[in-house]
Curated annotation (Swiss-Prot):
One of its GO terms (cellular component) is plasma membrane. It comes from Yersinia enterocolitica serotype O:8 / biotype 1B (strain NCTC 13174 / 8081). The chain crosses the membrane at residues 20-40, 54-74, 82-102, 107-127. It comes from the Bacteria. The keyword DNA-binding does not apply. It is a multi-pass membrane protein. Keywords: Cell inner membrane, Cell membrane, Membrane, Transmembrane, Transmembrane helix. It is found in: Cell inner membrane. This is Protein PsiE homolog. It holds the Pfam family PsiE. HAMAP family: PsiE. Belongs to the PsiE family. GO terms for biological process: cellular response to phosphate starvation. Its main location: membrane.
Amino acid sequence: MAKNSRSQWIAKNLQRLLNVGLIALAAILVVFLIKETFHLGKVLFVNNQDASSYMLIEGIVIYFLYFEFIALIVKYFESGYHFPLRYFIYIGITAIIRLIIVDHENPIDTLIYSGSILLLVVTLYLANTERLKRE
């Protein structure tokens, strides 16, 4: 019994440490989200249209990445200390879309990235079927 209670004590304290770390990470991500908001505001008023539109689109996608990570942390606490798989898939899709927007010079790479997005969408569909859905 003593060994079991010690294991529970260790698990409980590690969970607390993880929670504190995630709260700190969420605070850092909120700061970056605010910085990105100001950056997007600056890009909107730049005169160079070609560079400005690409920077704006890239900034918006980065903004969504920060937003998705914060939403993932919120969902972790709401769902009883569990990270839902579909949020990681959303983040992966958004990150690959950002990569396509930023680095679209090689058509083969773009095709491979698009195939990766298709694979993630199929995975998301399978993860949301009634057999595999938890929530």
